[in-house]
Curated annotation (Swiss-Prot):
Active site: 138
GO cellular component, one term: tRNA methyltransferase complex
Similarity-based family: Belongs to the class I-like SAM-binding methyltransferase superfamily. TrmB family.
Transmembrane segments: none
Species whose genome carries this gene: Brucella suis biovar 1 (strain 1330)
Binding site for substrate: 142, 174, 212-215
InterPro entries named among the record's database cross-references: SAM-dependent_MTases_sf, tRNA_(Gua-N-7)_MeTrfase_Trmb, tRNA_methyltr_TrmB_bact
Protein name according to UniProt: tRNA (guanine-N(7)-)-methyltransferase
UniProt keyword terms in alphabetical order: Methyltransferase, S-adenosyl-L-methionine, Transferase, tRNA processing
SUPFAM superfamilies in the record: S-adenosyl-L-methionine-dependent methyltransferases (SSF53335)
HAMAP family reported in the protein's UniProt record: tRNA_methyltr_TrmB
Chain spans, region Disordered: 1-22
Catalyzed reactions: guanosine(46) in tRNA + S-adenosyl-L-methionine = N(7)-methylguanosine(46) in tRNA + S-adenosyl-L-homocysteine
Chain positions recorded as S-adenosyl-L-methionine binding sites: 64, 89, 116, 138
Length: 233
């Protein structure tokens, strides 16, 4: 059964509601049958070589936190079959979209987790990831909720621990305040370097970027996206 209350959470409450529209029968079946085969088992200590997590042989491992409907993650894992991907999404309807996509086009280089991403970060070995993507995270607009934003000193410490030197942390948002917040936090953190040289480095989408449903909605409503890339020193 799907636990919509989802009692397991890590140190921070970084996401809001977990469930939207009721799932269709096929989607519920995918949660019962497909997700257990792809979900990381955090009760088992992580291997020092994360490549062993995947059915396909991979050279490096990347992580996407809060993949929404999975448009980018499914696209990227197909585009780079030599890389392993860990995707985390606590929102049940987003995970349902990803499972439906994987049911049609499987990715042997992809593993999933449907709870708090900080639990995965704390489970991973040191210097084990080649990249972390955080695209359009919940901005938590109200000041009293800013502490829930995923970009924080504590989570940047987590990123710094699990990222290899030279690895990328990529962040995209259409919320100017959150963009500035992320720039301030990353630029004052000793482990990260922002190497932008011109406005194109943050105004232009990432190479090969497929776009997302959320981004398309933001563009229709007149908002623009900013794409930041930080390098692990």
């Amino acid at each position: 059964m799907i636990d919509e209350n989802h009692p397991m959470r890590a140190a921070g409450n970084f996401f809001g509601r977990r469930h939207g529209k009721p799932l269709r029968p096929h989607q519920s079946n995918l949660f019962e049958d497909l997700l257990p085969r792809l979900k990381l088992d955090l009760a088992t200590p992580a291997s020092q070589d994360l490549r062993s997590l995947f059915e396909a042989p991979v050279e490096t491992v990347r992580m996407e936190i809060g993949f929404g409907g999975g448009e980018h993650l499914h696209h990227e894992s197909g585009r780079y079959p030599q890389s392993g991907f860990i995707g985390v999404e606590p929102f049940i309807n987003g995970m349902a979209k990803m499972l439906a996509a994987l049911d049609q086009a499987p990715r042997p280089n992809l593993r999933l987790y449907d709870e708090d991403a900080t639990a995965v970060l704390d489970w991973l070995p040191d210097a084990s990831l080649a990249g972390i993507d955080l695209f359009y995270p919940d901005p938590w607009h109200k000041r009293r909720h800013w502490k829930r934003r995923f970009v924080s000193d504590a989570n940047l410490d987590r990123f710094a621990r699990v990222l290899k030197p030279g690895a990328k942390f990529r962040f995209a948002s259409d919320i100017e305040h959150y963009v500035n917040w992320t720039l301030q936090h990353c630029r004052r953190h000793a482990a990260f370097d922002w190497q932008a040289e011109s406005p194109a480095d943050w105004n232009d989408a990432y190479e090969g970027w497929p776009g997302t449903r959320y981004e398309a909605k933001a563009f229709r409503e007149g908002r623009r996206a900013v794409y930041l890339t930080f390098i692990r020193r």
